[in-house]
Amino acid sequence: MARKSKTEPEPYGGVQPKKVPEKSIDGKPTIYTYATCPFSLKVKSLLKSRGIDFSNVEVDPMKKTELKWSDWTKVPVFVDADGTHVNDSNDILHYIDETNGGKFPRKGVDSKQDEWMDFSNDILGKSIVAVIYKNYRTSLHALDYVTRVDKFGLKDRIVNKWLGAIIMRMVGKSRAKMFDEPPRENLTNQLNSMSGAIEKDFFGGESPNGADFANYGILRSMQGLNGFDIVENHDVIWPWYSRMQLLSDV
């Protein structure tokens, strides 16, 4: 295999210059994903809330064979029915909304929405990792679930469950060091911050905007895992979460 040129540009988010219609499955908008990926769940929640019929391609987490065609190897990757290729979950949310009714502002138009969409990646995503992978026991529980749901072969499932639990425990520990409070207390405080930004029923007021889908996807990936009780017991976030789940059926 030829080595990548040092001058070759790095892959980037947003709409890509080259269309790949052959990667649109059955002529439908197509998402390349892991079933349990929080960033993929952002996109799925928007697609399903809008009633958009789409194809879902489960990516092998080890080999990533299904994404060999793309320089961007992180999920989700989105390919529209016409072959338009979009990278990065928040950019995908903006693209889908813009091409399907334009119900929330574009990036750079609403600073509050931008702030809370960034929060989903920079703060909330890291906060839940610190809780889910708090110790080896909780890490093993999470990896048992992930390796059963995602597209792992039997051998890879066994290896990734046990070895992955050790690795993710280390990741969880490193994420915890990013915050001043212990993981559960930190997540509670982050949810408190979110609750102050939810106006009426949603971040977007009477209807959800990009911040709703971005943060819902992150928390949805936590459902059934260690620490989700923090979400369930929050006076503001749990009703909001329930509204988003009812709306998206994800």
Which residues make up each language-model segment?
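C-terminal active-site "lid" helix and adjoining low-complexity regulatory extension at the edge
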Residues: 237-250
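GST-like domain detector, emphasizing the conserved glutathione-binding G-site
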Residues: 2-156
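Short alpha-helix boundary/capping motifs
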Residues: 74-76, 222-223, 241-243
